[in-house]
C-alpha cells in the first residue's frame, strides 16, 4: 500500500497533534511507501521555519527523535493507492491540490481533527449541545459522534512506542504531576485554551520524569485542549 500524505503548509500551524501523530505512525509502518508532501520539516528536526519551542506542547513526545527521510519525492511521477489530506483545512487550506488527487485515481481521504467545541463550517446539535460535526465524507474523524455515514471512520491521537516507560513504584514521591490542569484541582480555570502559560517544563525528559514520579496523572474535560496529555500520562506510568 502506498500513501501520499498532504501536510499542512502554513509554517505557523505545523504542530497539529493529529496530523503529526498519524504521519509518524504511517511512516513507521510503511516506510518509503508513505510520502509526505510538502515535506514536513519539523518531523526531520528541521525547525528553520518553525522553531520547536513555538509548537503546541513544545513538540514534546511526537518529535523526540526525527523520522527517517525518504529518497524519492518526485510525486508526480509516482502512483499511490490513497491520497490523505492532513488537517490543513482547519487552517484555511483547501484539501484539493491541482493534479494531486489523480495520483491515486481519485481515492482521496481527509483527516478531520476538529475538537467537539469551537467553530467550524458545519455545526450540529448533540445531546443538547451545539458541537462541531463531521466536515467531510471519505474522512477519518477525531471525536466522532455521528455514525450514519459509512465513509467516515473514527481516528485519534497516538504516541511513539519509544516514549513508553516501565512503571517504577520505587521513584514515586509525589501525589500528582506539576502540570495538572487547575480545573482538575477544583481551582479557578486559568490554563485552558492552549498557549504556553501551563507549560512548566522546557526539557522533555524533565517533563516525563515528573509524570513518572507521580502516583496519579490528573486531567479533566477541556474541549480538546492538550489531549496528548492523556497519552503522556499513561506511557509515563503515572
Identify the function of each model-found stretch.
Residues 2-238:
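Nucleotide-sugar donor-binding catalytic core of glycosyltransferases
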Amino acid at each position: 500500500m502506498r500513501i501520499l500524505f498532504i501536510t499542512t503548509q502554513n509554517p505557523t500551524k505545523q504542530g497539529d497533534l493529529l496530523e503529526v501523530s498519524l504521519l509518524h505512525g504511517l511512516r513507521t509502518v510503511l516506510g518509503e511507501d508513505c510520502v509526505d508532501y510538502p515535506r514536513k520539516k519539523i518531523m526531520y528536526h528541521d525547525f528553520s521555519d518553525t522553531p520547536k519551542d513555538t509548537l503546541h506542547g513544545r513538540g514534546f513526545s511526537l518529535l523526540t527523535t526525527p523520522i527517517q527521510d525518504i529518497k524519492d519525492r518526485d510525486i508526480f511521477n509516482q502512483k499511490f493507492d490513497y491520497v490523505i489530506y492532513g488537517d490543513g483545512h482547519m487552517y484555511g487550506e483547501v484539501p484539493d491540490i491541482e493534479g494531486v488527487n489523480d495520483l491515486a485515481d481519485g481515492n482521496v481521504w481527509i483527516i478531520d481533527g476538529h475538537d467537539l467545541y469551537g467553530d467550524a463550517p458545519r455545526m450540529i446539535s448533540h445531546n443538547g449541545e451545539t458541537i462541531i460535526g463531521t466536515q467531510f465524507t471519505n474522512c477519518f474523524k477525531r471525536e466522532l459522534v455521528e455514525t450514519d455515514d459509512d465513509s467516515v471512520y473514527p481516528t485519534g491521537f497516538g504516541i511513539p512506542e519509544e516514549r513508553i516507560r516501565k512503571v517504577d513504584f520505587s521513584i514515586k514521591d509525589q501525589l500528582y504531576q506539576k502540570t495538572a490542569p487547575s480545573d482538575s484541582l477544583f481551582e479557578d480555570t486559568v490554563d485552558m485554551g492552549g498557549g504556553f502559560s501551563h507549560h512548566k517544563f522546557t526539557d522533555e525528559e524533565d517533563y516525563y520524569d515528573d509524570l513518572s514520579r507521580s502516583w496519579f496523572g490528573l486531567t479533566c474535560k477541556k474541549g480538546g485542549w492538550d489531549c496528548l496529555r492523556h497519552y503522556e500520562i499513561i506511557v509515563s506510568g503515572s
